[in-house]
C-alpha cells in the first residue's frame, strides 16, 4: 500500500472518530497532539502521518465549504443522510480535488473508490465515484 493511501485511510479514520466528538474545535497544536495520540493508539505508520495531518487539518479548516460542495454534487442527498464513513471519505477526496494541486482529480477519485471498497458498504464505491465525479466537474467551473 502506498504511503499516501495509508495516509488517506488514517485521515478517514481520524475524521470518522472526530464526528463523534462534540465541538472539537482544536487549535493547530491541539489537533496535532490529538492526531499523534490517535497514531500511537492505532499504530499509524510514521511515513504517512504528515500527509494525513495535512488532509485532516485541511478538511477541518474548510469543512463548511467542502460539505456545501458535496451536497451540491450529491443531488437529493443531505450530508446527514450520508453514512459517517462515506461522508468523511468524500470530505478527504473533495479536499484533495479542490485544494491539493499535486493530486490529479482522477487520482483522488480512484483512491477514494478503492478505500470505499475496503471501509464502506457494498454500494459505497459507486456512490463515492458518482459524487466525486460531480465534485470534479463543479471544481472545474
UniProtKB/Swiss-Prot annotation:
Pfam assignment, any one: NusB
The UniProt record lists the keyword Isomerase: no
GO MF, one example: RNA binding
GO biological process annotation, one example: transcription antitermination
UniProt keyword Transport, yes or no: no
Biological role: Involved in transcription antitermination. Required for transcription of ribosomal RNA (rRNA) genes. Binds specifically to the boxA antiterminator sequence of the ribosomal RNA (rrn) operons.
Entry protein name: Transcription antitermination protein NusB
Family: Belongs to the NusB family.
Provenance organism: Desulfotalea psychrophila (strain LSv54 / DSM 12343)
InterPro entries cross-referenced by the UniProt entry: NusB-like_sf, NusB_fam, NusB_RsmB_TIM44
Cellular component, GO, one term: cytosol
Record keywords, A-Z: RNA-binding, Transcription, Transcription antitermination, Transcription regulation
Lineage of origin: Bacteria, Pseudomonadati, Thermodesulfobacteriota, Desulfobulbia, Desulfobulbales
Amino acid at each position: 500500500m502506498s504511503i499516501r493511501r495509508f495516509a488517506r485511510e488514517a485521515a478517514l479514520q481520524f475524521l470518522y472518530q472526530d464526528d463523534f466528538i462534540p465541538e472539537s474545535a482544536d487549535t493547530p497544536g491541539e489537533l496535532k497532539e490529538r492526531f499523534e495520540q490517535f497514531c500511537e493508539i492505532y499504530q499509524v505508520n510514521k511515513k504517512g502521518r504528515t500527509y494525513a495531518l495535512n488532509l485532516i487539518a485541511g478538511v477541518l479548516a474548510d469543512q463548511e465549504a467542502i460539505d456545501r460542495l458535496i451536497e451540491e454534487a450529491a443531488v437529493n442527498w443531505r450530508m446527514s443522510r450520508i453514512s459517517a464513513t462515506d461522508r468523511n471519505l468524500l470530505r478527504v477526496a473533495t479536499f484533495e480535488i479542490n485544494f491539493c494541486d499535486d493530486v490529479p482529480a482522477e487520482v483522488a477519485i480512484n483512491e477514494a473508490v478503492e478505500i470505499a471498497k475496503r471501509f464502506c458498504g457494498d454500494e459505497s464505491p459507486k456512490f463515492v465515484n458518482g459524487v466525486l465525479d460531480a465534485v470534479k466537474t463543479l471544481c472545474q467551473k
